[in-house]
C-alpha cells in the first residue's frame, strides 16, 4: 500500500502534506506550498488522489532540486569551498572543528573519527 513519487515510497494512508516531507529536500513548509499551488490538498490523503493529481504533484516536484540532484549540488558546493583554502576549509581538511570550538581538551571525537572529505 505504497505510492512512488520521485523514487520515494510513501504510504497511501498518509496525509499529502506530511507524506511529501519524506522526500529529501522537501520540508513541511515546502509541502504546504506545493499543495496550495497545485490544488488544495491539505486535508487529502494519497489514496484519495486521482492519477492526474499524482502527475501534477510529480511534475511540480521535478522542477525543484530534490533527492539525488540536491545531494550532488550540496557535494559540489562543499568541494568548491574546500578548494578556496579558507580557514574553515583548512580545518575540514585537518579533520578538526571549524566553528571556533577549543581543541586542547575537547574535540576528541572529531579527531578520532574516520571522516571522508567528500
UniProtKB/Swiss-Prot annotation:
GO terms for biological process: translation. The keyword Nucleotide-binding does not apply. Pfam families: Ribosomal_S13 (PF00416). Belongs to the universal ribosomal protein uS13 family. Part of the 30S ribosomal subunit. Forms a loose heterodimer with protein S19. Forms two bridges to the 50S subunit in the 70S ribosome. The keyword rRNA processing does not apply. One of its GO terms (molecular function) is tRNA binding. This is Small ribosomal subunit protein uS13. PROSITE patterns: RIBOSOMAL_S13_1, RIBOSOMAL_S13_2. It comes from Carsonella ruddii (strain PV). Signal peptide: none annotated. Located at the top of the head of the 30S subunit, it contacts several helices of the 16S rRNA. In the 70S ribosome it contacts the 23S rRNA (bridge B1a) and protein L5 of the 50S subunit (bridge B1b), connecting the 2 subunits; these bridges are implicated in subunit movement. Contacts the tRNAs in the A and P-sites. Keywords: Ribonucleoprotein, Ribosomal protein, RNA-binding, rRNA-binding, tRNA-binding. One of its GO terms (cellular component) is small ribosomal subunit. InterPro entries: Rbsml_uS13_C, Ribosomal_uS13, Ribosomal_uS13-like_H2TH, Ribosomal_uS13_CS.
Amino acid at each position: 500500500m505504497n505510492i512512488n513519487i520521485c523514487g520515494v515510497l510513501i504510504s497511501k494512508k498518509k496525509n499529502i502534506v506530511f507524506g511529501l516531507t519524506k522526500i529529501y529536500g522537501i520540508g513541511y513548509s515546502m509541502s504546504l506550498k506545493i499543495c496550495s499551488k497545485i490544488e488544495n490538498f491539505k486535508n487529502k490523503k494519497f489514496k484519495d488522489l486521482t492519477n492526474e493529481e499524482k502527475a501534477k504533484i510529480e511534475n511540480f516536484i521535478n522542477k525543484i532540486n530534490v533527492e539525488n540532484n540536491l545531494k550532488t549540488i550540496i557535494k559540489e558546493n562543499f568541494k568548491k569551498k574546500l578548494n578556496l583554502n579558507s580557514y574553515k576549509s583548512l580545518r575540514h581538511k585537518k579533520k578538526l572543528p571549524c566553528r571556533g570550538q577549543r581543541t586542547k581538551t575537547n574535540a576528541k571525537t572529531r579527531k578520532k573519527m574516520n571522516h571522508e572529505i567528500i
